[in-house]
A protein has these predicted regions:
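Active-site-adjacent substrate-recognition loops and nearby beta-strands
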Residues: 300-309, 327-342, 365-367
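Glycine-rich, low-complexity segments
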Residues: 1, 271-276, 283-312, 317, ...
Length: 419
């Protein structure tokens, strides 16, 4: 029905065809089971079968493509041999030529798709610039709009992954999630504006609104929690908790663990160090800022089989006599035991027993490393000092006994002389 609709067809070379509209199915020869509805819809179709094309110029250039559904003005207009596609909306899949198995729903969704296969683009301009990227799912207005060749991506949310061009195997879920990603790959961003400024960063996981917001090129980071990892660029970091790792200005760090916005747990993954209630491990494998306790005593390996160069400890008493015990108050009682404390001055102990003092100098960031004392290591020294003192005491006792015996003998001798 319509002027020159199905003009090239005869009743003997096609079947079950419906052509309605000016020059609809104009060049159809043997294509069967087609429905072309609208001016010039399916105009150049020759042998393509089982197509449904509804709208002005819809599927205009289709020749042999079959099993397509194009609905909307100029939807799938340039498709020639592509098959098993569903394009719904104005200019949806407009430039598709030989793409297969695509679903584009929304005005200009998949507009530039040329030969890419098995994509699902839902939303106005979703996947608009895609030409060869395959196996993508873009859902939301302008989701994946600039994607050209990136493949295996899932972008869900308005403007999610809008600037992605070549990045692949990314999952962006949330409004503007991964907004500026261009070539970054294998990222998972979930939450509004999650990973918003990421451009080339790879293998990141950002979960939570604004998480990893300002990361651009950092790789292998895990930020979980609203605003986690804001203003951070770096690699191999783990931030867990709302606002954890949120910095007021641009910040770069690598290989760090942060749990809780107040640094409840902090780790230096490259140095195998862990700190609690602070973001400074003070060059120690395990550091607690504040009071710590437990239900069982602290155990330290001491098996003889683990040791070498074993020698008795000498001069312990003299070392102990040189130590000066003090009472003191910490300047910062927020992170230290409040009130009066008992201890030593580390710098003084270092002059006497350097083996029990660590610290000093500066860390890789230029921060001062405070001295600390291994108080438990003083125990063997105190034991040996007591033993030395006991030995001296025994010697004095023996000497005293001898003196007492001599005095007693002299007293007897004097008494005999006086008789």
């Amino acid at each position: 029905m319509g002027n020159e609709a199905g003009k090239g067809s005869t009743s003997s070379n096609y079947s079950n065809a419906i052509f309605i509209g000016y020059q609809a199915g104009y060049n159809n020869t043997t294509g069967s089971n087609n429905v072309f509805l609208g001016t010039n819809s399916g105009r150049t179709n020759s042998t393509g079968e089982s197509n449904v094309m509804i709208g002005n110029l819809t599927g205009y250039n289709n020749t042999t493509g079959g099993s397509n559904v194009f609905i909307g003005d100029q939807a799938g207009k340039q498709n020639t041999v592509g098959y098993c596609n569903v394009f719904l909306g104005y200019n949806a899949g407009y430039k598709n030529i030989k793409g297969v198995g695509n679903v584009f729903i929304g005005d200009e969704a998949g507009y530039s798709n040329d030969s890419a296969n098995f994509n699902v683009f839902v939303g106005i301009s979703a996947g608009h610039d895609n030409t060869s990227g395959k196996n993508n799912v873009f859902m939301g207005t302008s989701a994946g709009k600039a994607n050209i060749s990136g493949e295996g991506n899932v972008f869900m949310g308005n403007c999610a992954g809008v600037y992605n061009t070549t990045g692949y195997y990314n999952v962006f879920v949330g409004g503007a999630a991964g907004f500026r990603n261009t070539s970054g790959q294998s990222n998972t961003f979930m939450g509004n504006l999650a990973g918003y400024y990421n451009t080339e960063g790879q293998h990141n996981v950002f979960i939570g609104d604004y998480s990893g917001l300002d990361n651009t090129t950092g790789e292998r980071n895990v930020f979980i929690g609203s605003h986690a990892g804001n203003n951070v660029n770096g690699n191999d970091n783990i931030y867990l908790g709302c606002g954890t790792g949120y910095f007021s200005s641009a910040h770069v760090e690598n290989h760090r663990l942060r749990i809780g916005s107040n640094n409840l747990i902090y780790g230096e993954l490259d140095n195998n160090r862990v700190a609690i209630n602070t973001d400074n491990a003070n060059n120690l494998t395990f550091y607690v800022n504040g009071l710590a306790g437990g239900t069982n005593p602290w155990q330290s390996p001491s098996d003889k089989r683990l040791k070498t160069n074993i020698k008795p400890l000498h001069g312990a008493l003299q070392c102990v006599l040189k130590l000066q015990g003090i009472t003191f108050n910490w300047k910062d009682e927020t992170n230290h035991r409040p009130g009066q404390n008992i201890g030593f001055i580390a710098q003084e102990v270092k002059e006497i027993l350097p083996e029990v003092v660590s610290g000093g100098g500066k860390d890789e960031k230029g921060n001062e490393i405070y001295y600390s004392i291994e108080y438990a290591t003083l125990t063997p020294l105190l034991v040996e000092a007591i033993k030395e003192l006991n030995e001296e005491n025994q010697t004095l006792n023996e000497t005293n006994k001898k003196l007492e015996a001599r005095i007693e003998a002299l007293e007897k001798l004097i008494q005999e002389k006086l008789k």
